[in-house]
Amino acid sequence: MASPGSSAPGGVAVVGSGLIGRSWAMLFASAGFRVKLFDIEPRQVTDALVSLRKEMKMLELSGYLKGELGAEEQLSLISGCSDLREAVEGALHVQECVPENLELKRKLFAQLDKIADDHVILSSSSSCLLPSKLFAGLAHVKQCLVAHPVNPPYYVPLVELVPHPETAPATVDRTYALMRRVGQSPVRLLREIDGFALNRLQYAVIAEAWRLVEEGVVSPGDLDLVMSDGLGLRYAFIGPLETMHLNAEGMLSYCDRYGEGMKRVLKTFGPVPEFSGATAEKVHQAMCVKVPDDAEHLAARRAWRDGCLMRLAQLKHQLPQ
C-alpha cells in the first residue's frame, strides 16, 4: 500500500457523495490521489460526478483550482462506485461522509471493519460523535479516528484529528501527514471530548451571541458585525491565545493585566439558551432581511461566502507566517 509520504499517491475511498464527500474527493484528487467515490445509490454517485465536473471547471476558470494538475487531470482521478468492497480495495485511507447519525455510522464502520486490511486508515468526518462510540468493538480500532473537516472543506483547511482511546499513534501520524499533503491544516486532539475543539469554541460564541440578542443588548445584525468586522478579522490570522500574547507584553503580562476583568465579566454569563421561541423568530427575521431563506438566495450567498473564503485562503498562503 502506498503511504502519504511516497512519491506516487495511492488510492483513497470517500464513502458518501454529499457536499462533504464531494469536497473530500476534490481535495484528494488535487494532490494526485486516485479517488473512489462511493454511495449506496448509484444515481447519487452519477449526480455527484456531474456536480464535481461543473465545480472544478468553474474553479479552474476563476484561477482557484487547487493543486498542480488541471481540472481534467484531477477529474480523471475520481471514479464512482456503488460497491463498498470495491471502493475500499487497495485504498490507503477511507474517509466516511455519511449523515451525522450514530447508528448509521456504526453500521457502516462494522461493514468496513470486515473488509479492511491491517493497513488502511478508517476515518470519519463526524462533527461531534465521539470515537469511543463510533468505533467501539471494531477489530481494526487501532486504525480508526475522526478527521472532522470544517464546512466547506475545500475552502476552509482545518481538520480536527480525534483518536479513539485505542487508536495507534501511527494512525494519527499518517492521517496528519495525509491532511498536510492535500493542503489541509490538521490539529491533533490528545483525547476525545464532546463537541471536539472547534464546535466547543463555536458553540460558546453562539451561546453568548444569542444571550446578547435575547437580553436586548444588541441587534442580530450588529452582533454579526462584531465578529465579521471585529474579532473575526484578527482570528483569521491569529488565534485567541496569540491575540492575548500580542495584546500585552506576552501571555503572563496579559493575564496579570486583564485576568480579574475577564473573570468578572465571565461570571455574568447566563445559562445555556433554548435557541427557540421569540428570540429564534427575531434572529430569523433579521437574517432573512439580509438573505431571504429561499433556495436561490441561500445558494447565491453560500457561493459568495465560498468565494470570499477562497480569496482569504490564497491571501494567507501568500503572506509570510
UniProtKB/Swiss-Prot annotation:
NAD listed as a keyword: yes
Record's keyword annotation contains Cytoplasm: yes
UniProt modified residues of type Phosphoserine: S6
Any single GO CC term annotated in Swiss-Prot or TrEMBL for this entry: cytosol
EC number: 1.1.1.45
PROSITE patterns, alphabetized: 3HCDH
Positions contributing to NAD(+) binding: L19, I20, D39, E100, K105
Keywords (A to Z) from UniProt: Cytoplasm, NAD, Oxidoreductase, Phosphoprotein
Top-level class of the enzyme under EC nomenclature: oxidoreductase
The family this protein is said to belong to: Belongs to the 3-hydroxyacyl-CoA dehydrogenase family.
Its job: Has high L-gulonate 3-dehydrogenase activity. It also exhibits low dehydrogenase activity toward L-3-hydroxybutyrate (HBA) and L-threonate.
Descriptive protein name: Lambda-crystallin homolog
